[in-house]
């Protein structure tokens, strides 16, 4: 990669030549401060900041000399308002990664210095620390719609989008389907009642089926609907719910609400947000999952259920009436789609996933936002690398379903090879470093005490930033919830989380990870479900017996729950 290409790729706004650094400490410091201030003024209205340090005279034998230079750069950057920027060093110094970590550990700057190393002439650059990039100054905790200004809409629309506890835009833009065909207004909906079934009905028929019409009317009249209970539970604990996220990212479609008929029907059937679980094809059998969403669960479920269960169920489940049914129904919506959520099963193993990407590429719909929930154990299919696809799209967010590290992670998500997961992440950093990646753990009683250690481990390895974690609180199955813990264990968890938050909060400008741990404390203390502990141990031992495992050999801290 040439210097010119780097300027273009990373929107470089200036360079500083370190050959100007001299033995005169004060003179050099004053010079460097002026250079930083000049760059700052030049990019005052920009959303990111990169400072390139030229390699002249920067390759030094003494770690101390290089450290002094870098430390002074950090001090100077702290004197300049860089709250909306990040600083990035490109250097030929082979010790850059080690020294950058030392300097960052001494700094309280929430926007730390980051580094790229190159062996020379800015060729073959490898990422040693993922650059902090807030190019849109995205505010995770804000519920305001991203694509419209609330001051520009009517007072009624403003109320629906920002104040109503019941309104959600999803029923006007979206349908969700399981691999078994059950359809819902979204993936957060409670599982009963179903809103239709794609094995007997088309998506368009479900669109104005009575449950959907009733839900829309409930939302507009401010009535609670049991379908939305999980989002309300999340909001009560302080989590940013799926409902709030829907209004934030899709609230610009509020005009569709005005066209709702008296019976709740909506004539306009154009799905701008997709979340169709094409099948249950998966290579893992996670503890919190089951046969509906994982084909690997089939044999275990047959042993657990016994009787005629195996005769009455199939390994692979598909959402439509045949393998092409869902695809054929979605094609007309390709002109309208703005965002696609890929989950599973395991989406990176599904041909339907790559079929959609191929069609988007063919139509040059690189503006479609791609969001993933993936176990991140496979990143290609039949020679097709998903990394090469992701590089082409304007916005890709990859949430890796990783609950714990090492043996714990392999136990909770059975079939995982932890070394492969870490290698996949390193390859992703090399091939498509600009793609948003975050850990998306399911917080359960099994990983609750270990999650902070896992989080810090990946940050220290340079695989994620501290902010790159999105806690998904497990609500079902209920016997895995963190609120089954007794008071003493909850107190221990809260203490561990409070300590972790002290480390995290100053490094989390997005505030997403911080909210996750804070809300988890609220969530577990809100309810006493200790009566489910017996169920937890019984279900765990049953599965351990089938899989020839023993949970306390892997997660010994759970002995405290006995």
Q: Model features per residue range: what roles?
A:
Residues 2-3, 32-45, 49-52, 57, ...:
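A short, well-structured beta->alpha microelement
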Residues 185-188, 224-235, 281-291:
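Local cysteine-cluster metal-coordination motifs and their immediate loop/turn environment
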Residues 56, 82-83, 92-201, 246, ...:
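Radical SAM enzyme [4Fe-4S]-AdoMet core and its adjacent flexible, acidic
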Residues 161, 191-233:
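Membrane-interface junctions of multi-pass transporters
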Residues 25-39, 63-66, 98-107, 384-389, ...:
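Short, aromatic/basic amphipathic alpha-helical patches
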Residues 271-281, 290-322, 335-351, 363-382, ...:
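Core AdoMet radical
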Residues 16-23, 53-56, 62, 89-94, ...:
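Structural motif
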Residues 237-273, 282-284, 305:
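Recognition helices and adjacent regulatory flanks at domain boundaries
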